[in-house]
Amino acid sequence: MPADRDDPVQPNRPDSPCPVQSAPAPPRWIDIGVNLTDRRFALDLAAVVGRASAAGVDRIIVTGTDLAHSRAAIALCARMPGMLSCCVGVHPPVAAAVGDELLPELRMLAGNPGVCAIGETGLDYDRDHSPRARQREVFASQLALAAELQLPVFVHDRASAGDVVAMLREHRAALVDVVVHCFTGTGAELEALLALDCHIGITGWVCDERRGGELAGLVPQIPADRLLLETDAPWLTPRTLKPRPPRNEPALLPEIGRVVAGLRGCAVTELASRTTANARRFFRLDGD
């Protein structure tokens, strides 16, 4: 009897009759828009970030919505630099509350570690919490600052009647990159933004059977290299989850990815790989 007759078959040997197949790597994601400084995350922030990591979310971009929240976002990034980056900016509902201090303060904040974009900035004519003329002034000043600092811009556009597109068109040549986050616009608006080489952020709005139908039809039209995913947590919890969690959080991003992949007719792993690469490129995260 040959000496090695009773040796067990080694599954990883080239001559093994039953080679072990490596399990596919689980999808990895980047959530480009989370309001982690919101008070609803105050009591369990570490657990929220931990659940996101366990769900395959490798990086969270914390949204800055005013100067105080931008400072808080920077502080969070200092606590969890391996998981968090942030934007600094003033979003349209509070545009009337800022004055001459805005640009010097934002310029200083943008120099902090972890800051990867200017925003959230833009226009919101749906709620009109600030006068529209003041919204446009504050948006224009932040676009100019982003151009000066050569940082990408994280844009809010809600019912702006084409004014966001018009202002982006005016400034686009000087801007390095633009994402219109939580896109909920029309096909014509999508076409105009793509013509300006903008990225498009898709949230759990696409999972909402009551109001997400038009967006669901547009998702396949977004070029693969322009697509980014976000939860916009704690809002916009995906309604496709049953039971529906009481609060959205970045650990639920894979559900948005699942729905988007289905709409685009691609594998979830393919979508995760592509949108993660897009986010790393957009926010200059290649050093992670």
Features from the language model and the residues they span:
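Mid-domain alpha/beta scaffold segments of enzyme catalytic cores
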Residues: P2-D288
